[in-house]
């Protein structure tokens, strides 16, 4: 078995060795809940990597969105080049769930655009768990959604060995059963092709490599892995496992049993609807379900097959769905990154799903078994866990209450101190703010200003602009792409002051920021809680000359705790710097990635000017739609999700305009 081995030119320093030892020891002792409290810039990901190396357990790292998951995945791949580091997020570029709005009698059909590359990565993740133990999967909260039965997935796997007696047609039949399609012309992921005694299989978990099985009569003569593009042999294999092309693949025997149970549930539900004088709903349910059953009998699956997952798995009513967590062995390790944000997300998922399903079941669009195609409840999520490490700069009450061991990581290897916090009275705050802004701009740095209300943010932005300060306002209506462009422009010095209400969201770790000001800091509430204040102060923790000004007439408990905690961290870092002769230096952070995203924002202007685009296509709306669809697929393939999503919206607008004209 391959062992986890961290490859890095750095060694753990500062608080890292102590944190690694403490958490690793807790894992060895069997502690279920532990917390790693790590300040911004202290190297939490490197600490996590070293804990994984010591624990030697299959590991799931849970992040609260796709972007953070991708960043973590890239970092772990650098630390573990010889181990399996996989990425598991929702494969939808666009997803409109099935719904029914009773007030307007509107049925909204499920509409989705699946990203083929992410689907491949999901298959790569699950197959890795069956093939090896040295696996790290970085996932978003989509890992708590139903995925199909892991036992069935494993049972349907086709195992091929050199010298094995196996009839070629029998293998082809099994490939079709696990939802591979024969395609001798367009050989792509999830397909196979046949030419004489040669069978080529393109695994669902691959994008460029396929398997060639050569037969001599009824015996497997040779197995090779080859490059799909060039046809060149990469390596000769003694054995290969072909995993199903769908996580919802089901054996014929189980499918027949499931269909029988679906028919019984349908009969029972139709009787119930008729008894309530819901004749239309009963007829609708019968027609839709019978169509699904017919599809399952003919091709082994149907659109929306996940709504029958409980019946296909043979689970009892109300039991939790099988998820990615069930694909892991029992002794797996879970890291929950930014746990103060991720855990509330996990808690909220199931309630939202149920409210949407209520109307679908009530009005005869779905059988009641659809309720069990859902995310896990928080209690079910807890029950599936083995050992958990919460990772956060500001862990919430849940993490601290449940954790039996807490390790703290305050020291930054760069020597950077937490910023100095100055409290000033509200009277004259705007004049004082203006003076502080001018002083900071003269030094060549940037400023973040947080307000409590939208009106104050707008008024302050207008005032600063009138005073000749280059200022922008970051509000909730600004989408991700434009937001990234604003941050990019701030870093470049296109403007100097960024005003906002909630500046805690990702993407605001800006080394050029040397001043963070918090207006109305003494107004207790969500945006001025201890957690929010510590996170806001952290925005200034990337610059050696940074400081934070809090404007307030009284020092609230949240302010007091924030100041006390920041001063404690500053003292620890200063003592460490003095002992090791470290001079704090501002983090030099490459802005290349932000520029790339900003380029996408520039491209949007072209798509937004549809009248000009139509003129260039002689008002041929179909040709323009075709062009944009091609660009959307290309963008999705290149993992440019923001660009692909915007193109999708443009295409919908064009299609609506076309229908209106007709």
From Swiss-Prot:
Residues 25-182 form the Helicase ATP-binding domain. SMART domains: DEXDc, HELICc. Residues 622-657 form the UVR domain. GO terms for cellular component: cytoplasm; excinuclease repair complex. SUPFAM superfamilies: C-terminal UvrC-binding domain of UvrB, P-loop containing nucleoside triphosphate hydrolases. The keyword Translocase does not apply. Pfam families: Helicase_C, ResIII, UVR, UvrB, UvrB_inter. It is found in: Cytoplasm. One of its GO terms (biological process) is nucleotide-excision repair. A motif (Beta-hairpin) lies at residues 91-114. Disulfide bonds: none annotated. ATP binds at residues 38-45. Keywords: ATP-binding, Cytoplasm, DNA damage, DNA excision, DNA repair, Excision nuclease, Helicase, Hydrolase, Nucleotide-binding, SOS response. Residues 429-595 form the Helicase C-terminal domain. GO terms for molecular function: ATP binding; ATP hydrolysis activity; DNA binding; excinuclease ABC activity; helicase activity. PANTHER family: UVRABC SYSTEM PROTEIN B. HAMAP family: UvrB. The beta-hairpin motif is involved in DNA binding. Belongs to the UvrB family. The UvrABC repair system catalyzes the recognition and processing of DNA lesions. A damage recognition complex composed of 2 UvrA and 2 UvrB subunits scans DNA for abnormalities. Upon binding of the UvrA(2)B(2) complex to a putative damaged site, the DNA wraps around one UvrB monomer. DNA wrap is dependent on ATP binding by UvrB and probably causes local melting of the DNA helix, facilitating insertion of UvrB beta-hairpin between the DNA strands. Then UvrB probes one DNA strand for the presence of a lesion. Forms a heterotetramer with UvrA during the search for lesions. Interacts with UvrC in an incision complex. This is UvrABC system protein B.
């Amino acid at each position: 078995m391959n062992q986890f081995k961290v490859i890095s030119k750095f060694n753990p320093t500062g608080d890292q060795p102590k944190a690694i030892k403490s958490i690793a020891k807790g894992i060895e002792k069997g502690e279920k809940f532990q917390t790693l409290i790590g300040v911004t810039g202290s190297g939490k990901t490197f600490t996590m990597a070293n804990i994984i190396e010591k624990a030697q357990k299959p590991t799931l790292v849970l992040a609260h969105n796709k972007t953070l998951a991708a960043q973590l995945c890239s970092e772990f791949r650098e630390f573990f080049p010889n181990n399996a580091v996989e990425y598991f997020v929702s494969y939808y570029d666009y997803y409109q769930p099935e719904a029914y709005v009773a007030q307007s009698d509107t049925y909204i059909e499920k509409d989705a655009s699946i990203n083929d590359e992410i689907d491949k990565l999901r298959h790569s993740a699950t197959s890795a768990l069956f093939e090896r133990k040295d696996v790290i999967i970085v996932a978003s909260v989509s890992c708590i959604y139903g995925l199909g039965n892991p036992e069935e997935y494993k049972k349907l796997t086709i195992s091929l060995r050199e010298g094995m007696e196996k009839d070629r047609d029998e293998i082809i039949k099994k490939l079709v059963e696990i939802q591979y399609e024969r395609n001798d012309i367009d050989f792509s992921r999830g397909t196979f092709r046949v030419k004489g005694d040669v069978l080529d299989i393109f695994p669902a978990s691959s994008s460029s490599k396929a398997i060639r099985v050569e037969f001599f009569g009824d015996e497997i003569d040779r197995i090779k892995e080859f490059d799909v593009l060039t046809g060149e042999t990469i390596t000769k294999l003694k054995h290969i496992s072909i995993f199903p092309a769908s996580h919802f693949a089901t054996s014929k025997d189980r499918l027949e049993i499931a269909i029988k149970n679906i028919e019984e549930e349908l009969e029972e539900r139709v009787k119930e609807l008729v008894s309530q004088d819901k004749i239309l709903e009963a007829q609708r349910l019968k027609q839709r379900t019978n169509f699904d059953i017919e599809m399952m009998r003919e091709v082994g699956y149907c659109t929306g097959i996940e709504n029958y997952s409980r019946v296909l798995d043979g689970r009892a009513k109300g039991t939790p769905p099988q998820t990615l967590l069930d694909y892991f062995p029992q002794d797996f390790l879970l890291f929950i990154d930014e746990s103060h944000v991720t855990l509330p997300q996990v808690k909220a998922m199931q309630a939202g799903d149920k409210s949407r399903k209520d109307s679908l079941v009530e009005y005869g669009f779905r059988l009641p078994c659809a309720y069990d195609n859902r995310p896990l409840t928080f209690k079910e999520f807890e029950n599936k866990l083995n050992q958990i490490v919460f990772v956060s700069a500001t862990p919430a009450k849940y993490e601290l209450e449940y954790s039996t061991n807490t390790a703290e990581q305050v020291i930054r290897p760069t020597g950077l101190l937490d910023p100095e916090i100055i409290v000033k009275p509200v009277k004259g705050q705007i004049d004082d703010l203006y003076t502080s802004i001018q002083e900071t701009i003269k030094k060549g740095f940037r400023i973040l200003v947080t307000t409590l209300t939208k009106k104050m943010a707008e008024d302050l932005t207008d005032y600063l602009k009138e005073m000749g300060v280059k200022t922008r306002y970051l509000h909730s209506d600004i989408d991700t792409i434009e937001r990234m462009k604003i941050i990019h422009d701030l870093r470049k010095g296109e403007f100097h002051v960024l005003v906002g209400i909630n500046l805690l969201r990702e993407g605001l770790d800006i080394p050029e920021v040397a001043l963070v000001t918090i207006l109305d800091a003494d107004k207790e509430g969500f945006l001025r809680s201890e957690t929010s204040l510590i996170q806001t102060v952290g925005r200034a923790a990337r610059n050696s000359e940074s400081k934070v000004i809090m404007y307030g007439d009284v020092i609230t408990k949240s302010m007091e705790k924030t100041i006390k905690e920041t001063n404690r961290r500053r003292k620890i870092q200063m003592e460490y710097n003095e002992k090791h002769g470290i001079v704090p230096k501002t983090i030099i952070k490459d802005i290349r990635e932000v520029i790339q995203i900003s380029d996408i924002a520039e491209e949007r202007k072209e798509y937004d000017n549809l009248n000009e685009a139509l003129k260039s296509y002689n008002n041929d709306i179909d040709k323009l739609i075709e062009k944009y669809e091609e660009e959307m697929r290309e963008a999705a393939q290149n993992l440019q999700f923001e660009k692909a999503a915007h193109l999708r919206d443009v295409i919908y607008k064009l299609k609506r305009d076309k229908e209106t004209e007709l």
